[in-house]
Amino acid sequence: NCDKPFLVIESAKKEYRSLALADKAQSLKVYTLGRPEYNCPEINPFFVQQGISLQTHIDFLKDLFNASFSFYGPMPYILEKCLQNIYRKRGWNLTLGYHPYFLGLNKKRLGADTLDAADIRSRYACKASKYLFPTMEDLKGEVKRYIEQEMTYEGEVAGNIKSAMLARLESLCSGSKGYMFNTRGRLDMSTLLNERAVF
């Protein structure tokens, strides 16, 4: 019996899950990916952790999508433009890497007091802040809009690119993957790392 926090990530085997049966205090949290009925986490991949620059986060998202799906031709470029657009539409400043809400809406200029970590942390903690971040559905809609209205490709080429990208994103917007990734929910990493948990 261990009172120390731990996190076990077991992707294939399920042996650690049996600890939950033996845990009388029920302090062990078991997360089950892809099974909403069994404590499936909601993870908005577009949520930017406090202290991470927006551009770095967008670069990580590009790498994640490129590793998960086989993008070809102009798809990586389209993805990058659409990622930037969905944050811009939510009010983010791509140059500074912040949303004005986190800096204080009434501040006219950036100064030393603008980047007060405690103030930003309290704004992140506000439940309404989750609406400042895009969702997978936002990305899917932006890809569709961008290809139809801004892309210079026409005819069959544009149709093939649109179909390929939307099919890939649709798979992340529906079913159990949609429950996990097409959400405004966010997994609180500080809580997760301070509890006894099995993924």
Model-found features: residue ranges?
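P-loop NTPase motor domains
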Residues: N1-F199
